[in-house]
UniProtKB/Swiss-Prot annotation:
Annotated EC: 2.3.3.13
Residue span(s) of domain Pyruvate carboxyltransferase: 39-317
Pathways involved: Antifungal biosynthesis
Gene name of this polypeptide: htyA
Knockout or disruption consequences: Impairs the production of echinocandin B and the ability to inhibit the growth of C.albicans under screening conditions.
Taxon lineage: Eukaryota, Fungi, Dikarya, Ascomycota, Pezizomycotina
Organism: Aspergillus rugulosus (Emericella rugulosa)
Enzyme class: transferase
Record-given protein name: Isopropyl malate synthase htyA
Amino acid sequence: MSTICAGGQTLESKYGGRAPPQIQLPDRQWPSKKLTESPIWLSTDLRDGNQALPNPMTTSQKWQMFRLLVDIGFKQIEVSFPCASDTEYTFTRALVETPGAVPDDVSLEVMTPCRKETLVRAVESLKGAKKAILFTYLATSDNYRETILQRSEAETLEHVRDCIEYARAITKEDPEARQTEWSLGFGMEDFANARPDAALRLAEVIQAAWQPSRENPVILGLASSVEAATVNIFADQVEYFSRHLSSRETVCISIHTHNDRGGAAAAAELACLAGGDRVEGCLFGNGERAGNLDLVTAAMNCFTQGMETGLDFSNLPEIRRVYESITQLPVHPRTPYSGDYYFRAFSGAHQDAIRKGLQKRAANSSKSPWKVPYLPLDPADLGVSFDNVIGVNSQSGKGGVAWLIQNGLALSIPTQLAASFSHVVKEQSVAQERGLAAEEICALFADRYDLRDSPSGRVVREHGYIAAFQHPGCALELEDVTEQAARAAGILTRGLDFLLRCTRAASHPLGGPDDSNLTVAFVQCAVTEKAEEAWGIGIGFSQDSAIDRALLSVMNRHYQPTPIRAPLATNDSVIPRPEPIRGG
């Protein structure tokens, strides 16, 4: 049974004929190639990006965006559509005329329709610039040409020849304009749906009219204006075009992809394998409809393959903050590289794998290739804190909890303690009906194990015995005690409703700059009379004092005031000492 679409058409009759013209390329080369260097990057945030905003940028916001793009490292920036409004034209002139605004190695690009009167306006906006790209465009596919231009192919070719010759005359052949280094770009609108032979004929006309050179090639923009096919088809189209151009060495092929099917980044990458030299896009994928190519994604894909990109995203959170402030568009939390959740693992298995991977890397002095499971790159390379790597919810496990405690409190807790505390975290997450932030988990840990203040007790050790225990409402302090006095303190256990037996202990020095003389101890105790296990944590100036405080931490949580009736038992010790430290 055929699906019936809106308007009563069948699925096949409505969408079945949209496939681009078939290209016969049995010897295609791009599938066996590998990217080894980054393409030229063109930012069109101030043009394509700006026109797609519900509220286009003000002049001050344009200046802010331009400075951001320069700081990132873009060398080609499309800044305006001068014939659209006086605001666009004036902004371009301000860039040219403001001393020091445009670095000498940055080319200003403006876009304009392929008409003589608009070409003049665009050239006037750029006069005096050190490096300028005059970029014009025209529909290339039969559908766009017939629907929008209502011209034959022959009429279109003649129109383009006339306009490009005119552009050459008013730029690089004009004595007054020669102080600017002019380049020409021509965008083939809807190239992805154009007949290959028609696109090549247009390219030959443009080359003949502009007369490019190896040193100053003409830029031919191949646009997937509305993504309508799989990315391999676009790659075939680009390779066919590249291989059949005459004077290929005088042409820079520029790739302009859109994200209508979600394939902008993949289409651009495969197009570069197929012959693309430059890619066009916007920060975070801004642009009409589903957006243009996300330049952050494209650049970081190269970066994570070991390629120099020339772009600096080492403080990506700040770049994103400025971008969101200017555009009022939020970056989706799942956006590659830049989203809040890009690095974040909620799965317990993933968290444990990340923790182990980072420990292995640290053990290798952090000089080995990056191979941490589930982390595509080091968050620090984007200026992202490791606090953002682990997200804890009711699905998380002990590995993530241990990682957050280590990062937030500098405590390397034993695996068994992490497992025990993870149940507490899960209960809290379920109760709150949300995930818990790292700060909340650290606070919960500190509260549960008496880490906010010293344990509510005082310990004086003599010959390995705990000699005092204190709790609100029940206190005993013995100072300068002898071994006999310490044994006499056995009355405490007779006054409690439980007895502790230490079953596991571990410790490590604290690693902070102010903690060089401190040790933290983790003690697991069997709580008799209650048939349960409990953990205590203590910090002291020695391993013994840290263990004492850890034991007090356990006693404080389990103490229930009861009348003390037992007689003094001089041969009893309060708490059996733990086994030797065995680690976590």
